[in-house]
A protein has these predicted regions:
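Short edge-strand/loop segments of extracellular domains
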Residues: 119-141
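Bacterial N-terminal signal peptides
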Residues: 6-16
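Short beta-strands within extracellular/lumenal beta-sheet-rich domains
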Residues: 79-95, 187-189
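Surface-exposed, low-complexity/disordered Ser/Thr/Gly/Pro/Asn-rich loops and linkers
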Residues: 58-86
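A short beta-strand element within beta-rich, extracytoplasmic domains
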Residues: 99-113
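Extracellular carbohydrate-recognition regions
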Residues: 21-52
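Noncatalytic modules at the cell exterior or secretory-pathway interfaces
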Residues: 194-200
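Exoplasmic/lumenal beta-rich domain surfaces
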Residues: 140-194
Length: 200
């Protein structure tokens, strides 16, 4: 089972004016609120008993060794070795039909150390973190084979796609414990470009 706590930070700038003074910073601290983020899951079979995958998401307290403040939590049992778990939020107030450059940071917590071995892959290095943006609502839909798939190009497993890029994994430095540790994953040096919706 792969579990993580996540904190998301976004840096947004117009591609036609990339000076720091023209940029907009959107920052979300989940200690006081979930800020309207919605969780979802994809890349698993549509079966009669969804509890088989033990899909869970919530806004809850972090482990005590991380201070106990609230955070977004998501987990699932990866029977398919391909389970995709995500948080999404609609951003408004951007210029409509405009190409923008995003640099996204995600702060998360993981208890899985580097170098561990698990069934279907390492619980740290083989759990990939991605970030992206699209001008429509991301959601999982059932394909003709009866599997939940995303309505965007996120890539598969360790590869990014047209709408999402890989920013790291959930492996923490090996400290000899199962305690959660804070990790920072970001797109610095690899900005992501997307065109905003007609409504901005």
């Amino acid at each position: 089972m792969k579990k993580s706590f996540a904190f998301l930070f976004f840096w947004v700038a117009l591609s036609s004016a990339l000076r720091a003074s023209d940029a907009t910073r959107l920052e979300f601290d989940f200690a006081q609120s979930d800020h309207g983020f919605v969780a979802g899951f994809a890349d698993y079979l549509q079966i009669s008993d969804p509890s088989f995958y033990e899909l869970t998401s919530s806004w809850q307290a972090r482990p005590l060794n991380l201070g106990g403040a609230s955070a977004l939590f998501i987990s699932g049992f990866n029977h398919s070795d391909d389970l995709f778990m995500y948080w999404k939020k609609k951003l408004t107030g951007l210029p409509p039909n405009t190409s923008v450059v995003l640099t996204m940071e995600v702060q998360l917590a993981s208890q899985y150390a580097e170098g561990l071995v698990g069934t279907g892959g390492a619980p740290g290095e083989d759990v990939i973190v991605k970030a992206g943006a699209v001008p429509f609502e991301p959601q999982a839909v059932v394909d003709p084979q009866g599997e939940w798939r995303m309505n965007l190009d996120k890539g598969n497993q360790g590869q990014g796609g047209a709408n999402m890029s890989v920013i790291g994994d959930v492996a923490k430095p090996d400290d000899g414990t199962n305690n959660y540790a804070m990790l920072l994953r970001h797109q610095h040096g690899k900005p992501f470009t997307v065109t905003t919706a007609r409504s901005g």
